[in-house]
From Swiss-Prot:
The keyword DNA-binding applies. The lineage of its organism: Archaea, Methanobacteriati, Methanobacteriota, Stenosarchaea group, Halobacteria. Involved in the transposition of the insertion sequence ISH11. One of its GO terms (molecular function) is DNA binding. It comes from Halobacterium salinarum (strain ATCC 700922 / JCM 11081 / NRC-1) (Halobacterium halobium). GO terms for biological process: DNA transposition. Keywords: DNA recombination, DNA-binding, Plasmid, Transposable element, Transposition. Belongs to the transposase 11 family. Pfam families: DDE_Tnp_1. This is Probable transposase for insertion sequence element ISH11.
Amino acid sequence: MSPATLQDDPSVDSFFNVVETETLALFEHLSFEFLEEFDVFAPAETGRTRDHEPPELMRGFLHCYYKDIYGIRPVERELRNTVVWLSCGFDRPPSRDAVDRFLTDLEHVVNKVFDHLVEQAALRGLLDLTYCIDSTDVRAMPADQDASKCYDPTDDEYYHGYGCTIVSTGQKIPIAAEFTESKQAPEETAMRVTRDALAVAKPIWMVGDSAYDTLDWHDHLLAAGVVPVAPYNARNTDDPKDIEYRVEDRIEQHSEDVQLKQSTLDETYNRRTGVERTNESVKDCGLGRTHARGRVHARAQVFLALCLRLVVAITNYERGDNPGSPIITV
């Protein structure tokens, strides 16, 4: 049963008029029925009906993350609230086993759920022509034995957890991401996430910090018709070039007719703060610290946080509010 169906029922019409909430607003413009198409949520081959309600449970988790409620038990407790489980479309509160199993199974397809929401954001024109890429830390619970000791070069400290590489655009809109073992991800990760971002739509600029000063990354983007802007890291060579950005050198290898002004590159690179704001916004949605014991649930939580950020942006856009706002006003 969908929230819309519930609101059409005269017996609860007055109820929802009284409790108009951010939860109802979150699900007003997006349908999650597409989750039922994934095989992972299908009944077991033995014929036993699995206690799965994918659209309702997805709405339930998004509600909880929006309210800063994480972890299987806290989520299950929150979904016992009559206002909440009715708002999410349940006929009755889900069991703890159902909540746990949904998160476990969701991990298999959560990146596809994220991709679906990215498409919805793109259809609404929420992307712009500058993409920014960056990695961020994902702190884990001490009891998470799958997490490892990671180094955060930004804060010059070690932490227990994982990492996430994100490409964002527009008003704090994540469009591609990969869950990683640590914040310092290998070059292959940057290449995969970059390809995923370009598959959504082609920008004019792709901005990264000096960690993305690699030939393969620059050449791949230039070949795709995108201008990469990352500071030249002179420490990568014994014979440093007299340039500020790697693209100043690589552009000559790809085109003799293209020239880039230093001021234009500087102005474009300054937009990199956009991905930092996106990272902070997604951390507010639950990415910053996982409340999971194990990599599977940790990865699911990270992508749920990314999904929530997209849902909030789309909801605000549809309601005529600022898509970049982290909250929904009702």
